[in-house]
Amino acid sequence: AALVFALDDLERVGQPYWGAYGIAQHGLAAMVGMLHAELASSSVRVSALQPGPMRTGLRSRAYADDNDLQAREAADYADACVTLLSSAGAAHRGQVWKVRA
């Protein structure tokens, strides 16, 4: 079994004006480490995926003038998600996998 969490870029959301969202993301990152330690002797793998910028409906509403050419379609990160959920995800156990599609 695998628990996989999605994380934003912690360095970016740790900056001024990110408020509750930034705090929540840092808390989630801490929880990944805690759960990994608590479940280390079990068959449950804990990891997180930190994708790069994604083109989503939420992003287009939050950043109406966004011209980020590095932003990718969410589907571009599907293979990384499948990897973490499969037995191959054992290589990333307890880690935050920073993926750039």
Predicted regions and their residues:
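Residue-level recognition of the N-termini of beta-strands and the immediately preceding loop/turn
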Residues: 1-2, 44-46, 94-95
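Catalytic loop of short-chain dehydrogenase/reductase
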Residues: 1-41, 53
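Short, local alpha-helical segments
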Residues: 41-42, 61-65
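Short aromatic-enriched loop/helix-cap "lid" or pocket-rim segments at secondary-structure transitions
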Residues: 17-18, 58-61
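C-terminal helical subdomain
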Residues: 48-49, 56, 64-101
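Hydrophobic structural elements of the Rossmann-like NAD(P)H-binding subdomain
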Residues: 4, 46-49, 59
